[in-house]
Regions:
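Glycan-processing catalytic domains of CAZymes
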Residues: 1-147
Length: 147
């Protein structure tokens, strides 16, 4: 795909909060509750998921129980996004020194190499104020090699 085939008006969310035992030492976010289906109740009777290969999701990811800190996984995700023609990823971000903060620079570098832009969704942290949001934005600009 050529760079001019990317649509910069088309954004996708990217949740880099998944961890696995091999990369991160433990499972992370794979065993969250499955949200109720909005129109098909047959999906609402699924058992609880303990994590591991039996993950908390209706569909098993093609790349398996991956880590969001794995270079190969991030590269594959960014390539999938590029093949779809999506020009911007929006990172879900919970703030400085969080699990989701560890891989921001890596994601941005891989996305930049593919000419994909990155924006941030500042998740609703506890006791968030306008001043804290300003500090979060300043941190992103200072630490992510913003382009």
């Amino acid at each position: 795909m050529k760079n001019n085939d990317l649509n910069y008006n088309l954004h996708t969310f990217y949740y880099a909060w998944y961890g696995n035992k091999e990369i991160d030492g433990s499972q992370r976010h794979w065993n969250h509750e499955v949200l109720p289906h909005w129109s098909n109740n047959t999906w609402n009777d699924l058992p609880d998921f303990p994590g591991g290969d039996d993950i908390g999701a209706n569909f098993y990811p093609k790349l398996g129980n991956y880590s969001s800190n794995d270079l190969s996984t991030i590269s594959k995700h960014i390539n999938m996004i590029k093949r779809a023609g999506i020009g911007v990823i929006t990172l879900s971000w919970w703030g400085e020194d969080t699990f989701e903060d560890k891989n921001v620079k890596l994601i941005m570098d891989i996305a930049d190499a593919q000419k994909i832009k990155v924006s941030f969704h500042l998740e609703p942290t506890k006791d968030r104020t306008a001043e804290k949001v300003v500090k979060m934005i300043k941190y992103i600009l200072d630490n992510s090699n913003s382009r």
